[in-house]
Amino acid sequence: MEKGVGWEASWLPSGHSGLVHYVIARREITGFELPHTFSHLGKEVLPVFSSAEAARRFLASLALSDRWHVRQFSTGELVSLLFILPKRVAWVLPNPPLGHLLTQDALSYLTRRDSFIEYLIAR
C-alpha cells in the first residue's frame, strides 16, 4: 500500500458526514485566505481537520498571531484551494495530533495532495 493512502478509515470520526473540513487560515489584504502550512523535508504540508474543535485546539497550540483563525471549507472549496496551491502544498496531514507534527506516527498519515484531492472528489 502506498504511504498515506490507507488513512481514510481514521480520517473521519464515527458518524461524521465528511462534507465539511477545517483549515487554519489568515485573511490577506486581497481577501484570499492563506492556509497555515508547515515544512517537512522541504515540502509544504497542509493540516486539515474533520472538526472545528480539533482545529481550534491545534490553532491554540501554535504560536501564531491573532490574525489566524479556523476556516470551514466545503469539499468543493477545499478541492479548489488545493488546486490553487499545487506548487506550494505537496502533502496533506489529516487531523494532526497536538504538539506532535513531526513524529513518525503523525507523519505516517501524510497524504500526497493529489491523492487527497482524488479522495475528496470520490466521496
Give the residues covered by each predicted segment.
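Conserved NAD+-utilizing ADP-ribose enzyme module
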Residues: M1-R123
